[in-house]
Every structure is written in structure tokens, then in C-alpha cells.
Amino acid sequence: TTEESDTIKLGGNFELSGGASAYGTLMDEGIKMAVAEQNAADGLLGKEIEYVSYDNKSEPSESTSVATRLATEDNVVAILGPATTGAANAQSPAVTRAKVPAILPAATGDGVTMDGDSVLEYVFRVCFQDSFQGKALAEFAQTDLQATKAVILVDNSTDYAIGLADAFKETFTGDIVAEENFTAGDTDFKAILTNIANLDYDVIFLPGYYEEGGLIIKQAREMGIVQPILGPDGFANSTLVELAGADNVDNVFYASHFTPNSEDPKVQDFLAAFEAEYGKPADSFAALAYDAAQLVFDAIANADSTDPQAITDALAATEDFEGVTGTFSFDENHNPIKSAFVIELQDGVEVGNSIVEPAK
């Protein structure tokens, strides 16, 4: 058992290659930094923390294998990751069987901590969920952008985008003038953009990831479509601006878990340390993963134990955890009660952010 061991082993199940590797790599780096900092401050319970991570190749089936290997062969006391909702759902049966807690930094799909109506005892997340960001973006569209007519361009190949579109439609009180579909991996969006080019609307809602998002922004702006474009947290990657071209990224807004422009000294220290360690800026995914690691350290300290069940119970009891992505407690479904940021981009650069509070 881990009780006799002189290190505390934490596992990482991340997308280090494949389609979601831009997210997974930053998360893995955020955790490595948190572990190094904690070890420099004398570790936990008098022991050094050892972090073991494997690549799930952005494949759900591989995510299951990695989780099983970490829990049963490496005997980790907790697993951090994976990044995506699909990979997280694939991991859940394995961590439930092994009775080892998993902390999801960024899996935003609504049901990810649930099995039907009952909560998964060993699954927690530090990010807000899709129904919340879909609602928050609809609120932002009608309140901050004063939009009364919207067009939705939805990636109909991912549960992520479909869930976001549904939550937006439920909340938006104006008219949905048109809804067009695309598929992950598409590169030419002229047809769907031509369909909406001459319609009368105030905002485009674009639930999808940064690859297609960046190309759609580029092609829309090049066709003279000037309306604000609103996206989810999947836009939060610098590749979005690279693909779109900075001069095309005007009036683009997206939901984020994190803003680097926070005054909080904790956030500024984190950003400086990450930049020094990796020679690149931290993004919201690095920040969420860093918080996920800190949350586990917190739970181990509060449990005063390296027993996975004791850590699980301490995680469930988390209250007012102060992370770099905000302060939160867990609700009964292991979702954090926290705010979202809506980031505004002009010329590809963040020029402002608004806070959208969770509904009480």
C-alpha cells in the first residue's frame, strides 16, 4: 500500500499527442510546476510527491487503459486528468472500480461527474460545466452585446458543442435566425458562411474548438461578416489567433475559466513562475490543472492521510478553496460553484474581460 511508501504518488492521464494535445500538454505542465513547488516547500505529510503521467493519445479507449494502469500498477493516490469530456467519461468506470479519486481540470460536459442521477463518488472537476457557460454566453449576448437576433454555427460532431448550443438556445430570449452545422476536421466553411452572410442578426454563437473556430473567424471576416462572434472555453488557445490571423480576430468573445489580467497576487505569481519554467505564457488550461493539483494537496493535508478514500472524502468536503481560477466550494454533484470570465479579443489580443456569476 501507499502508506508505507516514502513518496506520495499522483497520476496524470493526459492528451500529450493527438487532437487535444494543445490542451493536455499545458495541463501536464501546470501540474508538474505545482508538484515542484510543493516539493520545494517540504512536500506533504513529510513525504515527497511523485508525479507519474502517461499519454492517452486523445483517444477515449486509451484514457481507460491509462487510468487503470495508474490506479492498479502505479498505485497512485489520485489521478489528475484527462482534458476532454469524452476521455473523462471513458476513465470513470476504471477509477470507480479502483476507488481512486480523479480530478478533472477541464472536462466541461454536464454529466461527467454523474452516473444518471447519482453522483460518481470518485470523480470531481475544477471547471464550470457546459450548461453554465452556454447560459452565461447567452446572458452576455443579450445583456452586454444587446443582441436580439443570433445565428448559431455548431460543431455537430461533438457532445461538447451540441450541449453548449442547447444551453444557449434555452437561455437566449431573442430570435435564433439560423443554425448551421459543421464537423470537427472541416477546413472550408464558405458554404455555411454564405448561407448566413445576408441575414439580419446581431451575434454569431460558435460552439466548437479552436481549430475550426479559428478558421471560421478568418473566413467570416474575409467575407465581410462583421458581427461579434461568441465562443466557448474551447477558443482559449493561442492557436485560434494563429489560424484566424490577428487582424481578423476583432469583436471575438469567449468564455474562460481564467484571466491573466487578474489583480490577484496568486495569479500573477503563477503566471510569472510558469513563464520562467516553460518560456511561454500559461493559459486557462495550465491554470485549471495547477488548481486541480493544489486541490489534491489540500485534500491530502486536510485528510492527514494518503489513503485514496480519505482523500476522496476530503475532496467532497472542499469549501472556499482559493485557486488561480477563482475561489470555489463543491456542490453535491462534485461541481465547483464558481464564476466564468468572458474575454474580449480585438486584433487578436485580450482587451477586456467580464465576470458572469453562477445563478444562485
Label each PLM-derived region with a short phrase.
Residues 217-290, 344, 350-358:
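Extracellular/periplasmic periplasmic-binding protein-like sensory domains
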Residues 1-9, 40, 357-360:
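Short, low-complexity disordered leader/linker segments with a strong preference
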Residues 16, 120-184, 203, 296:
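An alpha-beta-alpha
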Residues 95, 164-255:
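Extracellular/periplasmic bilobed ligand-binding domains
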Residues 2-4, 8-32, 54-61, 83-84, ...:
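Extracytoplasmic "Venus flytrap"
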Residues 63, 125-150, 162-164, 188-190, ...:
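Hydrophobic alpha-helical segments within soluble ligand-binding/sensing domains
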Residues 276-286, 297-350:
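Segments of small-molecule ligand-sensing domains
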